[in-house]
Structures are given as structure tokens and as C-alpha cells.
UniProtKB/Swiss-Prot annotation:
Record's comment on post-translational modification: Ubiquitinated; undergoes 'Lys-48'-linked polyubiquitination. OTUD4 promotes USP7 and USP9X-dependent deubiquitination of 'Lys-48'-polyubiquitinated ALKBH3 promoting the repair of alkylated DNA lesions.
ATP-binding keyword on record: no
Entry keywords, A to Z: Cytoplasm, Dioxygenase, DNA damage, DNA repair, Hydroxylation, Iron, Metal-binding, Nucleus, Oxidation, Oxidoreductase, Ubl conjugation
Organism, as annotated: Mus musculus
Biased composition (Polar residues): 17-38
One function term, GO molecular function aspect: cytosine C-5 DNA demethylase activity
Residues annotated for substrate binding in this entry: 115, 141-143, 194
GO cellular component, one term: nucleus
The protein's name in its UniProt record: Alpha-ketoglutarate-dependent dioxygenase alkB homolog 3
Deletion phenotype: No visible phenotype.
Gene name linked to the record: Alkbh3
Residues with the (4R)-5-hydroxyleucine modification: 177
Length: 286
């Protein structure tokens, strides 16, 4: 009987460690590492990757903004662009004709120039041009499918203005296109003075009389824009009574211009655009 109790105590000693043994026995290294893992070691790599958290980030959008128009309203020479075609340059001379003389000239032009409203053609549809025009020069001039017949009978005041511009700019001209904007509803749409008869880099001298109107320019877009003018450079030039504007260099090749309609009432305005027309486009300067 004593032997059975002794064997039971011995067997119990193997089954349950004493408190002192439990306190001093170090934990198994393998079990410590296992308890620190995120999951059982037998899980596949694919299952462990599914437990990862991914943070979604919005893609950064490239926002294109149309550039603000450049305003030119002071006397000076301005190079507005440089391209393989060349330098595009405008020269602004406010007060080229003083106010008193400009008033007299405006009165003479409104009265004596043979103004006429011509029919334009756009996409095979004819429409009355929203302005009056007249042509002076020994050669005809064709633009926008409209042909202006030769008119060598220059008014003395027009010949005097042509000579004055030539003396002050060192440019020469043999023709003149006159535009009469009767009110704020008259305008001219986007275009370039790039007809073959003018040569590749024509010089255009624009002299204004009467109400101030805004002369707007926009650069022609590169080929990758597919004719979209949304993001091109733009220029605005207020043309006052007696102001002279010269466009030269690659301006007609690289830029378009217009005089838009106005929202507010405008008094009459006359614009004289002097240019050189060549009888044979093959002989025009390139």
C-alpha cells in the first residue's frame, strides 16, 4: 500500500511541474516566435498577401488652363512669338495722327470713300459682310473668295497718309483696304492676311480713326492640337483714334486677328490697312 502511494507521487511529479520549476523554466524560443506571427505558419503566401491593406490614392490630373491674354496698350515694338517661320512682331504708335487732324480725316473718309457692303462666302453660303469696305490700288485683291477690282484713284488724304507712314516706318505700300465699322454690331472674324499675292511675310500698316475698338490676336495652334485654339497665346490691343499699328515678320503666318462685336454702343470707326500686292505671286518675296 505504501508502495502504490509512492509510485503515484512520482508519476504526478512528471505530469505537473512544481511552482518553482514553472517560474524558473524559460519559454520555448519556437513558441515565442510563433505567438508573434500574424497567422499560422502554414498559410500560403497568397493568403498572407490578402491580409495587406492598400490605400487608394486619387490620380493626379494635369489641368490645362488657357493663358491670360497679353494686353499691349503702350507705344513700342513687341516681339510676340518666335518660331521656325520667324519672329512675329507688332509696333504700336498711339497718337500717330493728332486728335484735331484725326477728327477732320474721319469726317472726310466717312463722306468721300466709296463704301460698299460686299457679300462674303463661308462654306458655300453667301452672307452680307458686317462692315463696309473699299479698295485702292492698281491691282485687284482677292481674299475670302471676294475679289476687289483695281481702283487707282486715290483720295488725296489717303495718299498723304500712305506717304507719312512710309516716311516714318521705312516700309512702302501700293494698296489699301478700307474698313468702315458703323457701330458695335460691325466686325471682322478671325483671319490672317496671308494671301499669296502679299508674299510670305507681308507688312500690314493699320491706321484707325473714330471709336476705340479692341484688336484681338491669337496664335495658330501646333499640329498636335488638331486645330484647337483653346490653349493658344492671345493678345489684345485697344486701337484708339489716330493710332497706327504695324504687323510684320511672321505675324500673318503664325497668328490670326479679328475685331469682334461689342456689347456696348460704339460710334463709327474707320480702319485703313496699307499693304503691298504683287502682280505675280511667284515674284512675291519669300
Amino acid at each position: 500500500m505504501e508502495d502504490k502511494r509512492q509510485r503515484a507521487r512520482v508519476q504526478g511529479g512528471w505530469a505537473t511541474p512544481t511552482k518553482s520549476q514553472s517560474a524558473t523554466q524559460p519559454a520555448s524560443p519556437a513558441r515565442s516566435r510563433l505567438s508573434q506571427t500574424a497567422g499560422p505558419a502554414w498559410r500560403s503566401k497568397e493568403q498572407q498577401q490578402c491580409d495587406r491593406q492598400f490605400v487608394f490614392k486619387e490620380p493626379q490630373l494635369v489641368v490645362r488652363a488657357a493663358p491670360e491674354p497679353r494686353v499691349i496698350d503702350r507705344e513700342g515694338v513687341y516681339e510676340i512669338s518666335l518660331s521656325p517661320t520667324g519672329v512675329s512682331r507688332v509696333c504700336l504708335y498711339p497718337g500717330f495722327v493728332d486728335l484735331k487732324e484725326a477728327d477732320w480725316i474721319l469726317e472726310q473718309l466717312c463722306k468721300d470713300v466709296p463704301w460698299k457692303q460686299r457679300m462674303g462666302i463661308r462654306e458655300d453660303v453667301t452672307y452680307p459682310q458686317p462692315r463696309l469696305t473699299a479698295w485702292y490700288g492698281e491691282l485687284p485683291y482677292t481674299y475670302s473668295r471676294i475679289t476687289m477690282e483695281p481702283n487707282p484713284h486715290w483720295l488725296p488724304v489717303l495718299w498723304t497718309l500712305k506717304s507719312r507712314i512710309e516716311e516714318n516706318t521705312s516700309h512702302t505700300f501700293n494698296s489699301l483696304l478700307c474698313n468702315f465699322y458703323r457701330d458695335e454690331k460691325d466686325s471682322v472674324d478671325w483671319h490672317s492676311d496671308d494671301e499669296p499675292s502679299l508674299g510670305s511675310c507681308p507688312v500690314i500698316a493699320s491706321l484707325s480713326f473714330g471709336a476705340t475698338r479692341t484688336f484681338e490676336m491669337r496664335k495658330k495652334p501646333p499640329p498636335e492640337e488638331n486645330g484647337d485654339y483653346t490653349y493658344v497665346e492671345r493678345v489684345k490691343i485697344p486701337l484708339d483714334h489716330g493710332t497706327l499699328l504695324i504687323m510684320e515678320g511672321a505675324t500673318q503666318a503664325d497668328w490670326q486677328h479679328r475685331v469682334p462685336k461689342e456689347y456696348h454702343s460704339r460710334q463709327p470707326r474707320v480702319n485703313l490697312t496699307f499693304r503691298t500686292v504683287y502682280p505675280d505671286p511667284r515674284g512675291a518675296p519669300r
